[in-house]
Amino acid sequence: MILDNVNFPSDLKGLNMSQLKQLADELRLKTVNSVAQTGGHLGAGLGVVELSCALHYVFNAPYDRLIWDVGHQAYPHKILTGRKNQITTIRQANGLSGFTKRSESEYDPFGAGHSSTSISAALGMAVAKKGKKGRYNNIAVIGDGAMSAGMAFEALNNAGALDDKFYKNNRLIVILNDNDMSIAPPTGAFSNYLSRLASSKSYLKIRDFSKKLIHKLPNAIGKYPRKFEKAAKDWWMGGNIFEELGFYYIGVVDGHNLDVLVPILQNIRDNKSPDPILIHIATEKGRGYNDIIKSSDKLHAVAKFDPKTGEQFKSKSTRPSYSEVFGRKLSILAKNDKKIHAITAAMPSGTGLDIFAKEYPDRIFDVGIAEQHAVTFAAGMSCENIKPYVAIYSTFLQRAYDQIVHDVAIQKLPVRFCIDRAGFVGADGATHAGSFDIAYLINLPNFILMAPSNGQELVKMLNTSNQIDQNPCAIRYPRGECENNINYDDEEILEIGKAKIIKKGSEVAILSYGAILSNVIAAVEQLKQKNIAPTVVDMRFAKPFDKKLVNNLVKDHKVMITIEEGAIGGFGSILVNYLHDEGLVEKYNLRLRSLFMTDKFIDHDSQQNMQKKSNLDADSIVNIIEKLTK
């Protein structure tokens, strides 16, 4: 096994082409067997096995900077860069991250998790090296899906417009990994031949000589040779937007053919042309394993599985997820209300909107990885008396904050935000945790914020949201399952800002916001043994919250605790400010405590352990209440 002797990229340098191909086969098998034990993102990594081998064979990481966009596809890269023996700990507590991470390895020069950041980061690294001795390659590997985000094109536009002096001892190389063939198909052997020719030293030398000569000509004369060069290359290679943005374009290249990939990368490495380069490669997501596991999302994320049969070991549960409840109930509402439309940013199945899409394919819009556009697109729809429901993960909604403020809140447009994966998300760690949505929405005028404590409450809140026509509103709910026996025919509409008392008690009042209520209920059961019987309130609304109820509670309770699975600055902060502003803390000698996510980024772990690290689990709640009542 060649892979047994490969621990770092330097171990690849002495391999011949036959050995490199064998290494790729072994690396693919290692990736499959590793993910089979842990679950994780499989398809993207299998699609870049040959590319990973070629990049580490040709370039000199970490001296050369290699940045993987998103990071889903970085598993083979991790195996080749000193983490082979830890790969079966990926996405496990105290194990490797499922994404690239600077603190994990010097071979991960830039952390990822969200998409479309790689070109900007690589360009920043390239520009920062201006004037330094040596020659550096800064390589961004980005998928065609990530290219749908505006940020990627902002970076391309900036990179192509920069003066050549910024690239004197640097090279910016963008590798567009087209694994869905959504941009352009390769045209076979002739395309590969042209790509090798276009990257060759002789071609680029002639091109650079011509370029220098053209720049010395008067514009009136020089414009014709410039046009001729572009026209000639367009004829042979196919003109495209990347050339227009100032990149030298090579492609489309077979991303699984090392006989083609390696020479092209070597040509680029050895050439000193200052132009930024974009290499367009075609790969197959799930390469070598798609025929075993049949998956609509091309093995994007899988549970633990049998590597021989592809059977996934998913726990069988009859309980629906919050995402499923959302998708089903929205479909029911849409049956009687043709104004309802749904919007997702490349996550139809993750958000439950695949259910809606089956019923109403003409009333759902998947805008791609373009959260900013999604929000303003929804704002425009609402101007025309449509009811847009924007379903986005909490962590990705962060990317559209200016649009939420400027295009929705200020104009008081009734866009409905359905915020999935709110709170801790487990194995995907800090980059995907839904930590900040309460805090970044609660300070916006005109917004109504809701959070269900269970699946049936989500049904009621969707009913309620459909009746909110004068304000924007948001419903946040967690990753995971809710209770059985959801009554989807429930038509109850909640009174805006009205909380619900779950249990009447004395001395201690617990004000819970969202699904964290289940931990509160578990804590209250434990407190019975200690003769402590708190009042438990499901707040339902963080904005506006039930001030009348709060005012009554402070009169006959000595301790008030708020709890939410969100960052500091959320519901608890607003409530504490209110109580102090109204003078109620001093008047009733009230003891206050706000429980929320700890003020640090928590690495991947189980959702339960992450809650425990923030003192949001039942045992921690019990301990805190005991201390406050002594």
Please report, for each region that a protein language model flagged, where it lies by residue.
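Thiamine diphosphate
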Residues: 81-83, 89-121, 131-135, 162-298, ...
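Long, structured ligand/cofactor-binding scaffold of large enzymes
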Residues: 29-131, 157
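N-terminal amphipathic, basic-rich helices that act as targeting or association modules
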Residues: 1-79, 243-261, 275, 280-283
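Short alpha-helical segments and helix-capping/turn motifs at coil-helix boundaries
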Residues: 36, 48-57, 121-126, 150-167, ...
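Helix-enriched interaction subdomains in cytosolic or periplasmic regions
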Residues: 304-308, 442-487
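Extended, hydrophobic alpha-helical segments in both membrane/secreted and soluble proteins
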Residues: 138, 142-159, 352, 364, ...
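Glycine- and acidic
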Residues: 8-13, 32-40, 104-111, 246-251, ...
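A short, small-residue-rich loop immediately preceding and capping a beta-strand
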Residues: 38-40, 64-67, 110-111, 133-149, ...
